[in-house]
C-alpha cells in the first residue's frame, strides 16, 4: 500500500469518527428536546382549564343532504343553506387530563331516545315510543335531581382537555334516527330547560309512520346548541356489510352532514347496536373520535371511546324509574367487543 492510499484511508476514518460524534450530539439534543416537551405538557396539564377547539364553517344554498324517508316516500328536505358552530374533536388521548367541571365526574350516563310520541296501533317496537308527557316529566325530574344535559363533545373536552362543564351532574341525552317528533316534541322541552342533546341522524330510510326531519329542522337543532352525529346513511347492519358498504354508510354520511350543516360530526352511533372490529376500524378511519352502543352502563373516562354504553329509555318509564335506572347502571361492567342486538 503506497503512502497516498494510506493517507486517504486515514482521512476517511477520521471523517467517519467526526460523523459519529455529530450523530451522538444530535441524538443527545433530541433527547433533551423530548424531556423539555414532556415537562411542558405536564405543567400545562396541571394548570387551569383550556378552551376546547371550535370549528365554525358555513354552507349556503346547497342541495339537501338526503330525503329522510322510507324507500324515498316519507319526509322531505329543504335546500336553503345554513351555518353551525360546534366543539371540534381532535385525536383521542390515551391518558386523559384533569377535570375541572363537576367533582368526581369520571363517568357519565348517556340516555337513548327514539320516538317522542304515543305508539300507533300495530307499531312493531312500541317500547321505543315515549310520549311527550312522559318525556317532559322525565326531563323535569332529571333537572330537579341536579342533572344537567351536555353533549358528547363537551364530555370529551372535559375528560381530555380539562374544559369546564355546566354546573350540575352531567348527562348526555341522545336521539336516534332523526324522527320528526324529536324536533317537534323534544326540542321545546329541552329549550325551556336550557338543555342540549345529541342527534344521531340517519340520512334515509325512516319509517313512513313518523317520517324524518327536514334540513331546515335539523338546522334548528344545530342553532339550539344540539350536537349533530350520525347512524350512517340508512341505518344498515354494519356488522354484515362489506368494506365498500361500510365506507358508504360511514364515510359518506359524515362527509355529507359536515358539508351541509357545517358541523364536525365527531361521533358515530352503531345502528341497532351492531358492530365488530371491522366496523370500529372503519369508524375510526373515517375521522370519528368515538361511538355509542346500546350496551347498558355509564360511559367512563377510562373506557374505550368507540364502545360508549348508553341507557335505553322505553315508553312507560316513570320519572322515578328513570332515576333508578341511571343510578343502578353505574356499576355495569365494560361492554364486550361485539354486541349484536336490535
Residue ranges and their predicted role:
Residues 38-62:
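C-terminal region of N-terminal signal peptides and the immediate post-cleavage residues
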Residues 29-40:
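Hydrophobic membrane-insertion alpha-helices, especially the h-region
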Residues 206-211:
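Active-site glycine- and acidic-residue-rich loops that bind
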Residues 200, 231, 291-293:
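Short beta-strand and adjacent tight-turn residues that come in two discontinuous sequence segments
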Residues 80, 84-174, 179-183, 216-219, ...:
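C-terminal active-site subregion of NodB/CE4 polysaccharide deacetylases
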Residues 1-24:
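Terminal targeting segments of Actinobacterial cell-envelope proteins
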Residues 183-203:
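A short alpha/beta connector and helix-capping loop motif
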Residues 54-85:
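Juxtamembrane proline-rich low-complexity "stalk" or linker regions positioned immediately after a signal peptide
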Amino acid at each position: 500500500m503506497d503512502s497516498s492510499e494510506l493517507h486517504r484511508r486515514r482521512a476517511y476514518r477520521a471523517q467517519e469518527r467526526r460523523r459519529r460524534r455529530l450523530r451522538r450530539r444530535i441524538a443527545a439534543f433530541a433527547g433533551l428536546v423530548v424531556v423539555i416537551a414532556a415537562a411542558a405538557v405536564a405543567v400545562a396539564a396541571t394548570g387551569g382549564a383550556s378552551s376546547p377547539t371550535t370549528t365554525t364553517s358555513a354552507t349556503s344554498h346547497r342541495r339537501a343532504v338526503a330525503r329522510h324517508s322510507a324507500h324515498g316516500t316519507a319526509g322531505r328536505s329543504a335546500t336553503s343553506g345554513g351555518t353551525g358552530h360546534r366543539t371540534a374533536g381532535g385525536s383521542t388521548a390515551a391518558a386523559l387530563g384533569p377535570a375541572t367541571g363537576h367533582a368526581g365526574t369520571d363517568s357519565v350516563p348517556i340516555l337513548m331516545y327514539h320516538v317522542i310520541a304515543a305508539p300507533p296501533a300495530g307499531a312493531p317496537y312500541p317500547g321505543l315510543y315515549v310520549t311527550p308527557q312522559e318525556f317532559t316529566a322525565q326531563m323535569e325530574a332529571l333537572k330537579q335531581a341536579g342533572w344537567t344535559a351536555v353533549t358528547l363533545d363537551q364530555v370529551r373536552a372535559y375528560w381530555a382537555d380539562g374544559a369546564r362543564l355546566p354546573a350540575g351532574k352531567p348527562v348526555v341525552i341522545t336521539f336516534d334516527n332523526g324522527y320528526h317528533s324529536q324536533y317537534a316534541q323534544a326540542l321545546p322541552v329541552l329549550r325551556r330547560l336550557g338543555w342540549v342533546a345529541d342527534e344521531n341522524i340517519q340520512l334515509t330510510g325512516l319509517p313512513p309512520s313518523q317520517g324524518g326531519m327536514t334540513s331546515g329542522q335539523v338546522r334548528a337543532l344545530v342553532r339550539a346548541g344540539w350536537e349533530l352525529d350520525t347512524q350512517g346513511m340508512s341505518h344498515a347492519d354494519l356488522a354484515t356489510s362489506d368494506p365498500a358498504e361500510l365506507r358508504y354508510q360511514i364515510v359518506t354520511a359524515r362527509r355529507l352532514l359536515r358539508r351541509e350543516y357545517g358541523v364536525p360530526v365527531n361521533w358515530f352511533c352503531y345502528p341497532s347496536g351492531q358492530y365488530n372490529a371491522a366496523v370500529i376500524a372503519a369508524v375510526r378511519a373515517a375521522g370519528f373520535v368515538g361511538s355509542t352502543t346500546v350496551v347498558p352502563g355509564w360511559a367512563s373516562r377510562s373506557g374505550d371511546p368507540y364502545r360508549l354504553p348508553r341507557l335505553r329509555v322505553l315508553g312507560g318509564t316513570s320519572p322515578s324509574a328513570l332515576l333508578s335506572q341511571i343510578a343502578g347502571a353505574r356499576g355495569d361492567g365494560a361492554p364486550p367487543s361485539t354486541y349484536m342486538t336490535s
